[in-house]
């Protein structure tokens, strides 16, 4: 994998600065690292990791069957490949 060198603290600072512009931020959802890299390449402002989308990717209905371990592991993998801030729901 191609990990980025940007520290999470710098991603937070970048996100706060984007929020301070009062512009509408475009934050599409990513369900895997490849999608996150494409989101960054296209030029979006951040990446959104949704439990519902992740459940769909795993073949589960969106009724709370994904575990905290599933979400945290996938979110970690996604955040490592992009310099964009990652919002996890």
For each of these PLM feature ranges, what is it?
Residues 1-29, 33-42:
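N-terminal amphipathic alpha-helix/helix-capping segment at the start of soluble metabolic enzymes
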Residues 10-14, 60-88:
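Alpha-helix-loop-beta-strand connector modules within alpha/beta enzyme cores
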Residues 18-20, 51, 58:
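General secondary-structure edge motif
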Residues 26-32, 47-49, 86-89:
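Hydrophobic faces of well-ordered beta-strands that scaffold small-molecule active sites
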């Amino acid at each position: 994998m191609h990990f980025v060198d940007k520290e999470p603290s710098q991603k937070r600072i970048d996100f706060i600065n984007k929020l301070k512009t009062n512009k509408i931020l475009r934050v599409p959802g990513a369900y895997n690292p490849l999608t996150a890299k494409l989101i960054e390449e296209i030029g979006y402002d951040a990446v959104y990791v949704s439990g519902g989308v992740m459940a769909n990717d795993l073949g589960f209905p969106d009724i709370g069957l994904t575990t905290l371990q599933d979400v945290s592991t996938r979110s970690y993998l996604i955040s490592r490949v992009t310099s964009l801030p990652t919002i996890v729901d």
